Structure formats: C-alpha cells, structure tokens
From Swiss-Prot:
Quaternary structure note: Dimer of a heavy chain and a light chain cross-linked by a disulfide bond. Interacts with SRPX2. Directly interacts with SHKBP1.
GO terms for cellular component: apical plasma membrane; caveola; cell surface; external side of plasma membrane; extracellular region; extracellular space; lysosome; melanosome
Transmembrane segments: none
Protein name: Cathepsin B
Predominant location: other
Keyword Secreted in record: yes
Catalytic activity: Hydrolysis of proteins with broad specificity for peptide bonds. Preferentially cleaves -Arg-Arg-|-Xaa bonds in small molecule substrates (thus differing from cathepsin L). In addition to being an endopeptidase, shows peptidyl-dipeptidase activity, liberating C-terminal dipeptides
C-alpha cells in the first residue's frame, strides 16, 4: 500500500543509486554516506540504541485517508514574500515556536493538528487568546473517525473533530497546564539524554472528560471549537498563501529512514527504506543556498534535528509533503465576550 502513495521524486531517489549502505539506518555508515554526497543537508545522530520498529511506530499517520473539502484558492490575490516565518510574523503567539514530544505513541497526526490549532486561535484573536490545545483530548476522545489513537490516525479527522466536538486545553507532559495535559511521558530516543529509555509504543490512554484536579474550568466549558476545516490543494502557492493569511498548517509526508538522521539544511531523500507516514506542522518557507524549502516543526522534542525543526524541499511535492495539507479557522466569537 505504501508504495502506491509514494511520489515519483522519492522513488527515483530511492532507486537511482546502487552503492548506498545496506547497514542499519541509524549507523555511522549511513550518516557518513549522506554527508559525503553533494546534497542539501547534513546528517547526524539523533537516535541511539532504539529499535527500528519503535521508530516506524512514531510515524503514525495514515496517508491517503479521508478527505476534507478543498478550500477555494486565493493565492493570486496575495503578493507572497520570498521567505516567511510565522514565529516572526506573529511573535505574540508563543505556541508557534513551541516543540512538543509525542512520546512512545504514533500520535503525530494529533500533534500536528493541535499545534496548528493553537497557533491559529492566537493569530485569529490578535494575540488575545494564547492556549495550548490538548493533544490528549484529541488522541483519546476522537475515536474511530480519527483512526486508532497511538496506532495511527488521520489529520483530516482531527480537524473535523475540532469543528464538531471541540477540544479542551492541555499542555505537555507533567506541565499541569490547561484542562488535560498530555499523559504519555517523553522518552529518551535521543543521544545522552536524561529521560527514561523508549521501550516501544504504548496503549492509547482512556478518554477522560474531566479536567485534572486543580483546574478551575469544567471540561465542557473549556472547549475550543473550529468554525471550519478544509484541505488545501497541492499547489505550492496556495499552501504559502494559506500560511501567510491564516497561520501554520498541518501536513504529512512519507518518511524514509535517512530522515531520522536530519540535523540541518534542506532535507531531500537520499537513502533508506520507507518508515511510514508522518504528520507535522508547516510554519513558513524560504530559500537556502538556492534551494527552496518549507520550514517545519516536528514532534520529537527539541533535541531532534535543528532544535526540533527541519527544512524540506519545497515546490516538488517531495515525499508527498504538499499533497496532504489540512487546516481550519477557529470559532473566534466564543472568545469575544471574555475581553
């Protein structure tokens, strides 16, 4: 099934060379191989002593899943800049710069969604509402329309759930921020860290429609709703226009094992096997050394990649990065009475 969903650009990169290392994808051999290529990015060690089966489970997005209605294009009406970073454009919205950690769970589909929702609530209230939308609430309570929790899910289902049922607030693990903070602890899939070791993907926590002790607002009253949710066409300009006008979006792409070693530069697939589908948050774009890129936030903590972020080739639907864009607009009228 995966192969039918992998863009031609990735397949060509996968099959074009015969001298690629056949060793473990996290090995020094693989890292050295990538760094000896005349490519656009640098590899390094992000993971240490971690099973490949665990890493595959981190890629918990089902590509080619249910579709949301596609919004009407408007890029022709906008003069788009050569580069754009939502962190700078909306500096009064702290969630845009935040990197979360999905822990031992294939919940990337939920994280990409709630991160972008949090950003958009702040953006569309002109910085007046800063909230961390709860990944816990979405992961545990969305049910079958979103997929199978920690075993993988659909970004489109996440955004649809936001508009229909709403989501409460909730910060990262053990933060005691919001109604339902994340209950799956971060684990040490990186190098020389202090967190407990990753032992494999855990079960999806139970849906709990009650805020944690000490939070003053009820679960029902804490809900944040989307007004509308939609997909964005795979047009580079339309994706840029959507981010420029409304804020970061959720995207998904096919992950190959070389991506696990990304440290800096503009990622282009060079070597390795398919790991799975992975959802992320796209917050900007630019050009580095003549190579156009998307600026992306991952959910593997700040010690992965470039402080938790990465850049990936833009404009060629590389590894499907432009073909699974979803987003939505928050229901802002629910907030105006509070100001």
């Amino acid at each position: 099934m995966w192969w039918s969903l992998i863009p031609l650009s990735c397949l060509l990169a996968l099959t074009s060379a015969h001298d690629k290392p056949s060793s473990h994808p996290l090995s020094d051999d693989m890292i050295n191989y990538i760094n000896k290529q005349n490519t656009t990015w640098q590899a390094g060690r992000n993971f240490y002593n971690v099973d490949i089966s665990y890493l595959k489970k981190l890629c918990g997005t089902v590509l080619g899943g249910p579709n949301l209605p596609e919004r009407v294009g408007f890029s022709e009406d906008i003069n788009l800049p050569e580069s754009f970073d939502a962190r700078e454009q909306w500096s009064n919205c702290p969630t845009i710069a935040q990197i979360r950690d999905q822990g031992s769970c294939g919940s990337c589909w939920a994280f990409g969604a709630v991160e972008a929702m949090s950003d958009r609530i702040c953006i569309h209230t002109n910085g007046r509402v800063n909230v961390e939308v709860s990944a816990e609430d979405l992961l545990t309570c969305c049910g079958i329309q979103c997929g199978d929790g920690c075993n993988g899910g659909y970004p489109s289902g996440a955004w649809n759930f936001w508009t229909r049922k709403g989501l409460v607030s909730g910060g990262v693990y053990n933060s005691h921020i919001g109604c339902l903070p994340y209950t799956i602890p971060p684990c040490e899939h990186h190098v020389n860290g202090s967190r407990p070791p990753c032992t494999g993907e855990g079960d999806t926590p139970k849906c709990n429609k009650m805020c944690e002790a000490g939070y003053s607002t009820s679960y029902k009253e804490d809900k944040h709703y989307g007004y509308t949710s939609y997909s964005v066409s795979d047009s580079e300009k339309e994706i840029m226009a959507e981010i420029y006008k409304n804020g970061p979006v959720e995207g998904a792409f096919t992950v190959f094992s070389d991506f696990l070693t990304y440290k800096s530069g503009v990622y282009k697939h060079e070597a390795g096997d398919v790991m799975g589908g992975h959802a992320i948050r796209i917050l900007g774009w630019g050009i580095e050394n003549g190579v156009p890129y998307w600026l992306v936030a991952n959910s593997w903590n700040v010690d992965w990649g470039d402080n938790g972020f990465f850049k990936i080739l833009r404009g060629e639907n590389h590894c499907g990065i432009e073909s699974e864009i979803v987003a939505g607009i928050p229901r802002t009228q629910q907030y105006w009475g509070r100001f």
